[in-house]
Curated annotation (Swiss-Prot):
C4-type zinc finger segments: 57-72
SMART domains given in the database record: TOPRIM (SM00493)
GO biological process: DNA recombination; DNA repair
Keyword vocabulary terms for this entry: DNA damage, DNA recombination, DNA repair, Metal-binding, Zinc, Zinc-finger
SUPFAM superfamilies in the cross-refs: Recombination protein RecR
CDD domains: TOPRIM_recR
Database matches in NCBIfam families: recR
UniProt gene name: recR
Protein name: Recombination protein RecR
Amino acid sequence: MQYPEAISRLIESFTKLPGIGPKTAVRLAFHVLDMEEDDVLMFGKALVSAKRDISYCSICGNITDKDPCYVCSDKHRNRTIVCVVQDSRDVIAMEKMRDYQGLYHVLHGAISPMEGIGPEDINVSSLLTRLQADEAITEIILATNPNIEGEATAMYLSRLLKPTGIRVTRIAHGLPVGGDLEYADEVTLSRAMEGRREL
């Protein structure tokens, strides 16, 4: 069927979102047409605001609307431990657990040779710079996802960090292999943190 151009553009825009196929995009586009104009305008403003106002923390790489982020700014956090995660959604998942009181470092990805992603393509160099600048850090917890890419990233980082003398641990595999941190419940994450091991 031929849609009006404005609807076609809206459908095409929705299909660019992860997990949204053509049929879902059509449903969403027609839902937008049924919404009140004020709600559509608020939705559009929220999208633009999120894109414009959210940036990355200059210390840890987490998403934030102020620099440094709320975690790096919190003086009550344990500044001797840094938990390395793949993306900002993992920070949110860890924070829901409420057991971990250290700092974070967000890689913004994982090593994946099949996709042409190497260590230089993720936030590794800033981690090394951070470790050289902050002598208070005594432990790095590698909390990358328990899949092939996450394991490859953890092994790479453990080998890279060993010469520094900083303790390097890996979260335990209370998480399902092939799963993502952001989908784990608080109890599973808590057990995984308690069962972390030396690498």
